[in-house]
UniProtKB/Swiss-Prot annotation:
Keyword entries, A-Z: GTP-binding, Hydrolase, Lipoprotein, Magnesium, Metal-binding, Myristate, Nucleotide-binding, Palmitate, Transducer
Organism name: Sporothrix schenckii (strain ATCC 58251 / de Perez 2211183) (Rose-picker's disease fungus)
GO molecular function: G protein-coupled receptor binding; G-protein beta/gamma-subunit complex binding; GTP binding; GTPase activity; metal ion binding
Protein name: Guanine nucleotide-binding protein subunit alpha
PANTHER family: GTP-BINDING PROTEIN ALPHA SUBUNIT, GUANINE NUCLEOTIDE-BINDING PROTEIN ALPHA-5 SUBUNIT
Amino acid sequence: MGCGMSVEEKEGKARNEEIENQLKRDRMQQRNEIKMLLLGAGESGKSTILKQMKLIHEGGYSRDERESFKEIIYSNTVQSMRVILEAMESLELPLEDQRMEYHVQTIFMQPAQIEGEVLPPEVGNAIEALWKDRGVQECFKRSREYQLNDSARYYFDNIARIAAPDYMPDDQDVLRSRVKTTGITETTFIIGDLTYRMFDVGGQRSERKKWIHCFENVTTILFLVAISEYDQLLFEDETVNRMQEALTLFDSICNSRWFIKTSIILFLNKIDRFKEKLPISPMKNYFPDYEGGDDYAAACDYILNRFVNLNQHESKQIYTHFTCATDTTQIRFVMAAVNDIIIQENLRLCGLI
């Protein structure tokens, strides 16, 4: 009887070799593919980071893409002024100049979504005039008492340019534009030899149940916290402090069984607004155990420790950065550091170091 392999054995061996080769290819692809989940409470800056990645790694936005942001920026600007005017009524703050009432009516007549290539001149004029009113300014100073877009002041300060007939959004305008993220969006970037698949998920509570679909084989979590919101309440539940909500969410993510081996990068974001707020809104009013007064470094250390100390796994390292997501120069530097961290983590997971 011959000792050669049967047809079935040869076919079986060929199948095994093909499976082994496919597994090798999969491992190589997995080594070069980074699946990053962007997490954080609503309005923490996740979408802004994705825009920065496009600016830094994809050459920025085309003219057509910038055009598409016009209506978003117009709507953000008009709605922000509407929110202030409505807050003035509830806070019983009068206009300094009652002749501004005409401009108030102009704002209230606008639809929720502004459409068109150009902001109507009467709307631009109304915002410019109202922004100079002391009553409006006083209400703006109390914006922690209601829900106002972070970029309101930026757009109001730039209203003459935004309302110009030849207006074209620049990088900063695009970065500061705000559209609520619903569902899950995936964005792919190539950085060196690595392919990043970045998933942005809705931060509001109602969106969180959808995160489960992103959990499998996640390489890294980028968790964002808007530290400037230490004195604000949630949009969806105005009995809950935003920073407390972020701490609760970070605790659940950091110590989740899904993420025992997943590296976590923590961006303590919106440091520019945080630094502005500290002298006028004492952090001790919201966190009674804080003893650092309005010292910026002490406040940063306090918040950093509050988050890092939630980690219950000694083997898990939390990589932290203080960030301003609208500052492209800083984000370019920070993301380069993040890339180095991820490469090391990926090599470790693949057993290469």
